[in-house]
Structure formats: structure tokens, C-alpha cells
Amino acid sequence: MFRNVKELIEITKEKQILISDVMIAQEMEVTEKTKEDIFQQMDHNLSVMEAAVQKGLEGVTSQTGLTGGDAVKLQAYIRSGKSLSGPLILDAVSKAVATNEVNAAMGTICATPTAGSAGVVPGTLFAVKEKLNPTREQMIRFLFTAGAFGFVVANNASISGAAGGCQAEVGSASGMAAAAIVEMAGGTPEQSAEAMAITLKNMLGLVCDPVAGLVEVPCVKRNAMGASNAMIAADMALAGITSRIPCDEVIDAMYKIGQTMPTALRETGQGGLAATPTGRELEKKIFGGALGSRETTSAN
């Protein structure tokens, strides 16, 4: 079993296998299930993600009315041919938004690694699918690779907004996606680690400040940024660009930053955007009562 990214990469070198292979082997060891059973479960997760993306692209709106319809707008904008950032990145962004809009509308999603950050991995996966035309097995392996890096973060830092801010949720998801994109594109395990490091460095310090304590504002749009961040970081790593700070040290830095982050900025809905005049008005409109007094339990 690997405990950090360094050990993960060492295993791939020693055995001449992919990161996804290492994660699959670990799952087999821990769960005592066959490879076929593990693939079947991950295939189910993939199907859930695919359905969520499709539903979101058809258009959904949350019960509060705070979020919904933006994925549809983005797809229309892509078709217009006017996009500045290019169709592939915007496709990833729109599919990330689609997933989180479904989550906000009480639909079914697959937490990657949390519900609040569930759009980044499927958003990038189904966008890259259009360019690389992967097999179903390669798409499933994408999820195992992402999971390997998520496993390291969860065991050495945090994937919880309440513990580490949004950097721990969307930041982790973005890094996981970047690493998986690299493997799917034919990059090396070392490049996957570089992609994770580059991605996460750019999310450090991101707070968790959900308006009204709901996983809507700014969570949905942060998934959009997480998806675009992952795509850019993956390209940088594939181009041979490296992080001066090793991946494990970046993860440790994220953990320490989260430990020093004020409680008001860790999912409580007491600070940041949640505490703005508009944020408080939206909270009052949705829930009524004294502003800022409601105990929040939703993840960012």
C-alpha cells in the first residue's frame, strides 16, 4: 500500500505499471474483491457521472433558484464559435457545471471526492473523451488514477471543506482530474504527479464560504474553475513543465493552510461571500430568521 505520491510513483517504476494499475491492485487487496468486481463498481460510478452530466446539459434548476441553466448557456456559447478559451476547456467547464447543477437540484451524482466538488472529474473526463476517444476501460482507469491521488490527499491532508476550506474539496478534485488526464493522454506517472502539484498550488488558500450554507453559490462556479485549472495543468505537465515544490509537499502545505484557516471560512457560512450583504439577503430569502445564525452542515 502506498502512503504518499512519492511511494505511488516508485511502485509504478518498480513494476513498470500505470498509476491506475496500482490503485486497482490496492483496492483488490483492501476489499478482497476480484478485479472484475472492482471494475464493475467503478463502471457503475462512471454511469452515474455520465447520467448526471447529460441531465445537467438538458437544464435543471435548484429548488432555491440560486443555480441552474448555466451548463446549457455554456454549450450554446461553444456552438456559437465565439469562445475565447477554446471548445475543449469550455466543454469541460460546462460538464462540470452540469454535474453540480444536478447536485444542487437534488439529483444523483458521484462524489469525487465530495458532492460539492463532484463536477471537476466527470467534467474533464467527458470533455477529454471527445478528443482522445478512449475505450470504456480507459475511462474507468481515469477514475482509478484520480482516486489514487484522492486517496493520498485524504490520508495526508483533507478533502473536507469544514476541515480545510474549498482548497481541500475543489482543489483536491482539480488535482485528481489533472493527474488522470495526463495518464489518459499517454503521459508518465511522474507527469501525473507534476500535474497534481501544479493544479493544487493554484488552489491553495481557497476558502469554503457557501451562501446560506448551501452547495450552490459559489460552489458550482468553483467547479468550473477547477475543471479549467485541471486542463491547463495537465497540458503544462505533458509539455514537460514541472513543479519546483514536490507534489507531497504541496499536499502538506494545503493541510497546514487549512489548519490555520479561520472557522468562518471553513463551511460555516459565517464569512467570505456568505457574509456579504447580498449573501445574507439570499440566506434570509431562503430560510428567513436571523441572518448568519443558522448552523450549516453542507459541504462546499
UniProtKB/Swiss-Prot annotation:
In which family does this protein belong, per the annotation? Answer: Belongs to the iron-sulfur dependent L-serine dehydratase family.
Please provide an example of a Pfam family that matches this protein in its UniProt record: SDH_alpha
Q: Name one GO molecular function term.
A: 4 iron, 4 sulfur cluster binding
* Superkingdom to which the source organism belongs: Bacteria
Task: Please give the PANTHER family that the UniProt record associates with this protein.
Answer: L-SERINE DEHYDRATASE, L-SERINE DEHYDRATASE 1
Catalytic function, reaction form: L-serine = pyruvate + NH4(+)
Pathway(s) served? Carbohydrate biosynthesis; gluconeogenesis
Q: Does Nucleotide-binding show up as a keyword for this record?
A: no
In the record's cofactor note, how is the cofactor described as bound?
Binds 1 [4Fe-4S] cluster.
Species lineage: Bacteria, Bacillati, Bacillota, Bacilli, Bacillales
Tell whether 4Fe-4S is among the UniProt keywords: yes
Q: Which cofactor does it need?
A: [4Fe-4S] cluster
Q: State whether it acts alone or in a complex, and with which partners, per the record.
A: Heterodimer of an alpha chain and a beta chain.
Keywords (A to Z) from UniProt: 4Fe-4S, Gluconeogenesis, Iron, Iron-sulfur, Lyase, Metal-binding
Q: Name one GO biological process term.
A: gluconeogenesis
Q: What is its EC number?
A: 4.3.1.17
Q: Per its record, how is this protein called by name? A: Probable L-serine dehydratase, alpha chain
**InterPro entries linked:** Fe-S_L-Ser, Ser_deHydtase-like_asu, Ser_deHydtase_asu
